[in-house]
Amino acid sequence: MRSENEIDGVLLVDKASGMTSHDVVAITRRALNTKKVGHCGTLDPLATGLLLMTIGRGTKIQDLLMSEDKEYVGTLDLGKVTDSQDADGQVLETLPVPEFPREQIDAAFAKFHGDFYQMPPMVSAIKKDGVPLYKLARQGKSVEREPRFVHVYAHEIQSVRLPEIDFRVVCSKGFYVRTYVHDIGQELGCGAHLKALRRTKSGRFDVTGAITVEELKAGPREAVAARVLSLPAISRLRGA
């Protein structure tokens, strides 16, 4: 029999940089005193922003929520290629960065718009024979990966301060922004890695409505529980 104190729904959390998505799961479990907690779409430790936490019966719609489009804002750094494709990795190559005309930068971004295939990075949670690729990468191993069919619905170059470029991208499920940045760097001929990333939207949900990790840690349980969106509320928001 279920207790009246059990919580079902989705909690919007604004993940801080430097922590894993699993760290947020553990903090949420403690804050709500419940074991049944999942998350919708891993954010790398470097990244901040919206993480949908599924609570109780909310875990049953986790796959549905994960399938929705995402919006990110980020900063790429031209001239350095890293093994993880972001600033947390080891630098593999350093190249000079020309004074690119804006038209050339626009064209590089435009090449990765609409439908295309993307090769997942070795430093990722994708599994090969049950082993996450990032564990194989730590052992210095590289394995064949299947390219993924992805879609960019919208992109915007927000500012150019070479070697850095700030951008916004709206993309499909399974999209790696790190790889997007890496591929743009290859297109420009000088390499690039992801310096900063923030997820701002996931489906109909916006980070402006999220609880911070500090608020989550501070509690109390009742205050955190009050921020959980009920399953009927989720259906209404999604237009289901």
Predicted region positions:
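Catalytic/RNA-binding core of pseudouridine synthases
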Residues: 1-240
